[in-house]
Structures are given as structure tokens and as C-alpha cells.
């Protein structure tokens, strides 16, 4: 358990030392970095999460594009491997913020909510090409675009649905994933609804802040 009495706790060293090599648009992480991210992601899941259905969920992610997909088309993590990288960044930030919770947090629940909050983006992006003149020569330049094949209506709610196809979530985990975008998610109902979720489930607020920090401070 992660408790409020722990002012600092172990955070994976890669939170501080992992190289940021992927910021040029569509440049992508090199294959070694993507493999390292995959190894770390799977390792955390198998060491921390002990729940029926985990291996089926991981098998789906391995067969899909989770480990090579971008986190967005043009903003944070808009490069190959960006989605997995972002998920790990949110996990690291959430662990760093967990001491703020007034009640002890389950390390398993924190890992589930942070690492899987964006699985709605699996098989969500595709690559297209546009012409761009570079040094006087027209070239085809690849770029990411959205190819939504399953319209669910909500970002976080889609992740909750997809996870629970394989593995059950607690109400706290479901709320944390569903509300991770905070008040910017137009499908979340009223501002009061989100505030109530954060008040009832500290993990939901922590994952939201971790997601914002990873997006706007680390991955720009």
C-alpha cells in the first residue's frame, strides 16, 4: 500500500534518466527505446497487478499497436511509441503524487489506473501522407490521423469498457480512468460530477494530475 505517511517513495529511476529522443514530429522512438518501454511496462504490470484477466489484457495490447502507437496526432507524444511512453510517465508521476492522498492507495489500483487509462487509443491512429516542399523538392511526408473504428462517446469511458472486457475494475479504478481528463472531457457530465469523483476517490484526482503533468510538462 502507498500511504499518506510516506513523503517520498521509490520511483523507477527511468523517470529521471530515460532519454527523450522522440520529439521531432513523426520521428518516432528508436526500436531499442520502444523495446525498453515495452519491457518496463510489462514488468510493472506483472509485478504489481495480480488480477484475473491481466494476461489476456496484455496479450491484446501486444497484438494491437499499443507499444508503437503515438499518444496523439500532433500534441504530446505524437511519435511512434508515444502512447506507451505516456502511460509510463503517468504511472511515474502518479507514484510521486500518491503521498498526497488522505488515505492509503493500493499500488495495484494505481498501476491499473495509470498504465491503462489511455487504452482507448489502441488501434485509434493511422498514418497518411501529404506533400511538402523541402529544399525545393516535393516529398511525401507521413503524419498521424485519427481512424476511430469504435465510437463509444467518451474517452475515459471507452478505456473502462475495453479494460473490463478482459479484467474487472474496482469502482475507484473505473472512476480514475473515466475522469482522468478532468473538466476538459465534454462527455463527463457536469463539473460537479467530476469534482464529486475526485472527492470520493483520491486516486482519480492523482491520475488526472499525473496525466496533466506528463502531457504539459514532460512530453511537449
Language model features with spans:
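Cationic, low-complexity basic patches in intrinsically disordered or flexible, solvent-exposed regions
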Residues: 7
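Non-catalytic interface/linker regions that flank or bridge core catalytic/transmembrane domains
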Residues: 11, 15-69
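Histidine-centered, transition-metal-coordinating active-site segments
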Residues: 26-51, 93, 98-99, 203-220
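Active-site flanking loop/helix segments enriched in acidic
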Residues: 62-86, 143-145
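Divalent metal-dependent catalytic cores for phosphoryl transfer on phosphate-bearing substrates
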Residues: 77, 85, 97-220
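Conserved hydrophobic/aromatic pocket- or pore-lining residues that grip, position, or stack substrates
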Residues: 90
Amino acid at each position: 500500500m502507498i500511504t499518506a505517511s510516506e513523503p517520498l517513495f521509490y520511483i523507477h529511476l527511468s523517470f529521471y534518466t530515460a532519454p527523450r529522443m522522440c520529439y521531432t514530429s513523426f520521428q518516432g522512438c528508436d526500436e531499442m527505446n520502444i523495446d525498453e518501454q515495452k519491457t518496463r511496462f510489462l514488468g510493472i504490470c506483472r509485478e504489481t497487478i495480480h488480477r484475473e484477466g491481466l494476461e489476456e489484457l496484455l496479450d491484446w495490447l501486444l497484438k494491437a499497436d499499443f507499444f508503437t502507437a503515438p499518444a496523439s496526432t500532433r500534441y504530446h507524444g505524437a511519435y511512434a511509441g508515444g502512447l506507451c511512453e505516456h502511460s509510463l510517465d503517468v504511472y511515474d508521476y502518479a507514484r510521486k503524487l500518491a503521498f498526497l492522498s488522505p488515505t492509503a492507495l493500493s499500488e495495484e489500483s494505481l498501476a491499473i489506473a495509470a498504465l491503462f487509462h489511455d487504452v482507448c487509443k489502441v488501434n485509434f491512429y493511422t498514418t497518411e501522407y501529404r506533400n511538402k516542399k523541402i529544399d525545393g523538392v516535393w516529398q511525401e511526408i507521413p503524419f498521424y490521423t485519427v481512424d476511430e473504428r469504435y465510437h463509444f462517446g467518451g474517452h475515459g469511458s471507452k478505456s473502462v469498457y475495453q479494460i473490463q472486457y478482459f479484467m474487472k475494475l474496482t469502482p475507484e479504478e473505473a472512476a480514475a480512468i473515466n475522469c482522468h481528463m478532468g473538466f476538459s472531457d465534454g462527455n463527463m457530465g457536469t463539473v460537479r460530477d467530476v469534482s464529486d469523483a475526485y472527492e470520493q476517490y483520491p486516486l482519480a484526482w492523482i491520475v488526472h494530475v499525473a496525466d496533466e503533468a506528463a502531457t504539459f510538462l514532460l512530453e511537449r
